[in-house]
Amino acid sequence: MWTLKFSKGWETSDNAHLGRQFWEFDPNLQPSLEEQARVHNVCNDFYTHRFQAKHSSDLLMRLQLKKANGSEVKLPTQVKLRSEEEMSEEAVETTLRRAIRFYSTMQTQDGFWPGDYAGPLFLLPGLVIGLSVTKALDTVLSRHHQQEMRRYLYNHQNEDGGWGLHIEGNSTMLCTALSYVSLRLLGEEMDGCDGALRQARRWILDRGGATSIPSWGKLWLSVLGVYEWEGNNPLPPEIWLLPYFLPLHPGRMWCHSRMVYLPMSYLYGKRFVGPISPIITSLRQELYTSPYHMIDWNLSRSLCAKEDLYTPHSKIQDMLWDSIHKLGEPLLKKWPLSKLRQKALDFVIKHIHYEDENTHYLCLGPVSKVVNMVCCWDEDPNSEAFTRHISRIKDYLWLAEDGMKMQGYHGSQLWDVAFAIQAIVATDLVEEYGSVLKKAHDFVKNSQVRRNGFGDDDPSDWYRHNSKGGWPFSTPDNAWPVSDCTSEALKVAIMMSQMPPTMVGEPMDIRKLYDAVDLILSLQNSNGGFASYELTRSHPWLETLNPAEIFGDVMIDYQYVECSSAAIERLKAFMKLHPSYRKKEIQACMAKAADFIETIQQPDGSWYGSWGICYTYGTWFGIKGLVACGRTYENSKTLRKATHFLLSKQLKSGGWGESYLSAHNKVYTDLKNGKSHIVNTSWALLALIKAGQAQRDPSPLHQAATVLINSQLDNGDFPQQEIIGVFNKSCTISYSAYRNIFPIWALGEYQLKVLKRQE
């Protein structure tokens, strides 16, 4: 029986594994026949409707937590409104009480809410390939793991036989080829699962074979031994030896790209290839339209399937790769320049080890995690480093009714908790849920990063910004603070300090709040904007060298409306309570950030959301950041345009529903058939309330609140709808907690700032 475990492990940890979540199969646990039937039914239901509803609802976790929390939760009678005219405080309060009561049963004793943070389909194949080439596949993944992974891959195969970049996307060569390879490595036959693999293979071959897989796929297939390294564009490790003052030094890249291409350059420099087995030999025949030994690998370097191509290579980039491939690489293989290659490899592996140890072998993200692991195995298969990598794989795996997947992080723990606290505090029910807030507050207090790095080295030696005082997206073991995570957690700490300690626990030490403020101030760029993890270190023109055809805007850490707005709001809250600490610097920071937000507003009044879908998300942040700096509907044309934009997108139903295609195409796109989405609706409702819509015409707010109330399920939960997170323009990701958090937050604000004010 599968069980979800929390805060356990023998591995090193900064806070006794607080926030850790992983699934484990226990053969000694025997579920009842009723439990088996429930699990079977939810899994079978997902399979039946897999082409209509691509997103799982985290029902396996919900079943377990419901059982762990004892008897059925008693809820008030559900409210359903026939129209907004029936709206009342009682209806809103009943819905909120039902929602928070249900959501509180999903909270762990550690204070966080576990959940699915998957969605991209290129992550799991990388893990399967990485474990295969290190000869650890069957050791690390039990037959139960492998069975659930196969189920996940088949559940997300599109009707045309391929797999998308993410669960809602159209089929791509990258994920079709990698998923096909993964299923073969997981034991499936060539025509397995009633011809599903045969259909996938036909999809690949009909498009010219796997030679047109994008660059990340070329690397993984080369590592596996079913694609030649000569068919890759160069990733020379020597680039890490360049002077840092050069704009194209990799230390100036966005950290996620930097930490992925660091170990990739090691594997490229070593020309690493895993063991050649009969399955590898067979795959060399299955994936291509020509005999393997006759493929023109040099020509294949520049091939990319049209289904995958989001950011085409520039001519400058292709000229650069051609020059390095034809001139640089042959020279670097010969003495004495071969010594330079070895020096570069030594430099890179040293940085890999620093990242591993600094993050307790979690690494920044799932791609770098697996590539780092392969590098450590190549260096020494019996090393402690490889063993410690293996022990952290389960942190990235998540099980739901659609199968076992690899997440985009090892969870979104801190991020979800920070929003959940703000949502509950926004309601008029705080006193009823003090124990929930206390546990969540403790989690926030114990999740702050309290060090600047591993050991006594200067973080800049490893191309890192200071981290002390920040908060990460997940847990402090990750050790990568994020600007908006730090801002949101700071806001929570300030909010909790204003509430009775008997209800929510003791406030954070003021010195720790100072550390957070210091970090936020240090992250502001010269133009006033805030990026995600670090300062922006290079220039936008570097994007012309973006080698990842499947993503956009990955070369530098750009400034975002979300991060900039969060910084403004939280610094204002801090300054209100602690006006003596760096007041002038905070005021200047807020003013510059507000000016930046105004400069990046779109002509139609919206803001592009880079981390949520999409214009409703970005516009919510844009509005609340400007309001925090004193802008109002009356004195700000920017706010008036933003308000008009949101109102223009409201659907006849009263809600908002935005497709992931908005982010992909950079044009606002409704969901199919005019469907509303509870999270988009919540963001829009929050934004309009913040912009003072209630004082002008509350009717759109009543309509939106009606949609949210009528969307609530019988048990107090809210339905999982289309995927709502995004990154790098083209790929979506799950924020499974949003379906609970944001309806609570929006209805809470609506009750207190619209209905009660009308009275």
From Swiss-Prot:
Record-linked Gene3D superfamilies: 1.50.10.20
A Gene Ontology term for the protein's cellular component: lipid droplet
Alphabetical GO biological process terms: triterpenoid biosynthetic process
Keyword list, A-Z: Isomerase, Repeat
EC number of the protein: 5.4.99.-
Active site, renumbered: D484
Protein family (similarity comment): Belongs to the terpene cyclase/mutase family.
Designated name of the protein: Probable oxidosqualene cyclase
Organism of this sequence: Cucurbita pepo
